[in-house]
Amino acid sequence: MNIPLGEKVMLDIVAMFRQYSGDDGRMDMPGLVNLMKENFPNFLSGCEKSDMDYLSNALEKKDDNKDKKVNYSEFLSLLGDITIDHHKIMHGVAPCSGGSQ
């Protein structure tokens, strides 16, 4: 069966989240750190954000219910931020500069 690219990307995102989340379907800080370092090393190094403070802040910002874990919806919000930053870079904005596009 030929899976269209968009569907494959979505299925891969779901699988990535499940790989790093716990049995409760949520991801704690160690899981988020591992996921980011293993799957987004260029983003982290390009933004010079590979330190724990950035990841702690990302978890805190996206943790809407303040349970110190990221559910799937919160995780998608984080991925949205990363995707927006990559889009800005494609339009000549410096990585993580906060510029608009």
Curated annotation (Swiss-Prot):
It comes from the Eukaryota. Keywords: Calcium, Metal-binding, Repeat, Zinc. GO terms for cellular component: cytoplasm; extracellular space. Ca(2+) binds at D63, N65, D67, K69, E74. InterPro entries: EF-hand-dom_pair, EF_Hand_1_Ca_BS, EF_hand_dom. PROSITE patterns: EF_HAND_1, EF_HAND_2. Gene3D superfamilies: EF-hand. GO terms for molecular function: calcium ion binding; calcium-dependent protein binding. SUPFAM superfamilies: EF-hand. Residues 13-48, 50-85 form the EF-hand domain. Zn(2+) binds at H87, H91. GO terms for biological process: endothelial cell migration. Belongs to the S-100 family. This is Protein S100-A7-like 2. It comes from Homo sapiens. The gene is S100A7L2.
